[in-house]
Amino acid sequence: MVKHQPLQVYEKQVFVSFVTGIYGCRWKRYQRSQDDSSRWECAWFIILCSSFLLLLFWAYFWLVAQNDFNDFNWLVYNRSGEWRDETIPILASTTVGFSYITFLLILALFHISLGQQLNLYWVHKIGVLATLLTTISGVVSVDDIWGNEWDILLVSLQSTAPFLHIGALATVTAISWLVAGYVVRRERSNIQMMVLAMYIVILLALCLAPLTFTCPCIMDRHSLKPPPGVIGRRGAPMLAPENTMVSFNRALQHGASSLEADVTISVDGVPFLMRDRTLRRTTDVSKVFPGRQYEDASFFNWTEIRSLNAGQWFLESDPYWTVETLTAKERSRIGNQTVCGLMEMLRLAARTNSSALLNIRKPPPEHPRYRSWFMDTLWAVQKAGISQKRVRTVTWTPDTDRGRVRGLQQTTNEKLSVEEMRQRGITSLTLHYSKASYKDIQEYVANNVSLTVYPVNEPWLYSILWCSGVPSVSSDAPQVLRKVPYPIWLMSQNAYNFIWITSDLVSLAVVIGIFCFQKWKMSGLQNYNPEQIMLSAVTRRTSRDVNIMKEKLIFSELNNGLGSTEELSLYPENGYAIYSHGGLGR
């Protein structure tokens, strides 16, 4: 009786089928190949890697740019005339695109690791191209609308560089397995040497990268200065409508030590608080004065301005997704807000022993108060009941007519040297965070210059400026900064040097070990492709019987197909197998 034995037993390769199936729609074993990938597929792999790096950069940009989302929406509003949170579709598309490209890249790396031929499915090729082109168009659009925001990338590295360095080092170390497997192959080529050289350069650059870092929070904790004072920029605009009394009150409730407001002069000489050039976004002027909704806000008189509602827009548009957190009483109060006058805000500052930072928009030349706007502002300051001592705490921003307002603290938002500030009688400086380098901050603080940095809405940026010694920051989110009792991370120089050097040494040791292991593995093992099977009669005696049985079964099936009932015999002669009909003989 002949015992049947399978001609060939295939081991199930579920994971390989999953990888090749999703990446290239090669679900069956016969569809796969372990040959070298074509140049066309290698080019697509490069495109995939480039898309991943671009999306990684794009995602990181929007992660750190959260600090300025309000400014971005305001810029878009000034261009389109419609107020919408434009960051939501951008963040959603970036998340989807980055997840998709990352998943495909992981599958491609598994292909390389498993020795499978790359073959990206045509649907994925369309998806990769669409994602790449969409991201490029997004980068171009942001550069056009919001080009100065790229500076936040360099600023953020002051906080994230040590951690990005560790992550990048771990990634490059892991990739060494694939690089080593490619380089130590028997076939030598110039491309292999180029890949090896590029890898070594990247690895060494990462190891030495911390020499270029400037991280204010790498310092002795005993040298840390008190936390910067928080100025409520237009109050607390994330919790209540900007530049309204309820917004300023909320800012003070959340620990703001000062208030900042945007001042516009009405046609009858009354200073009021308004950020935009028109009243469309933050009032119901389109309902009350539909024919004047695009008119400059300064050409309305105070009676007309006071008749407008300045809170309902906040409840309807919910610009910061915070309306749901408000109580019914708070919503009712916000819904009844009117445009705030400068005098009201200054009286609130006087009652709470707070100072004020005023950003005054000079009226256009055809405005009736064009030549007397500063006198109107001074009149409101004096009328608010603030004593002469308290008047000095009110900051005067415009550079014009400084000699006529010596009673107020002189400031500028232009970056000047200490000597030039002294010559112009300026004692205070308000700078955008992108213009306030660590070196500049140290110089201003050492010369007793009152420095305020804006806008600071995220804990990481607040921590950097705290470690740098900035005395005060202007923020749209005092409720967020209130929850930062200490810098989010602080490390001594010695501790960081230890972490840096240790991580570099561990990485180098692992990379060298991987290259040595791959070299030993390649030189000590014979690589056979298990899917290529050749039946040969000239085999070792230990496997001869198995091969004979396989051949018997093959010819038995052939004979059965021809209708023959004779028994299959095998006669070996001179080491070869001879087949005949009849009995089985030796």
Features from the language model and the residues they span:
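Phosphate-group recognition and catalysis centered on beta-loop-alpha active-site segments
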Residues: 1-586
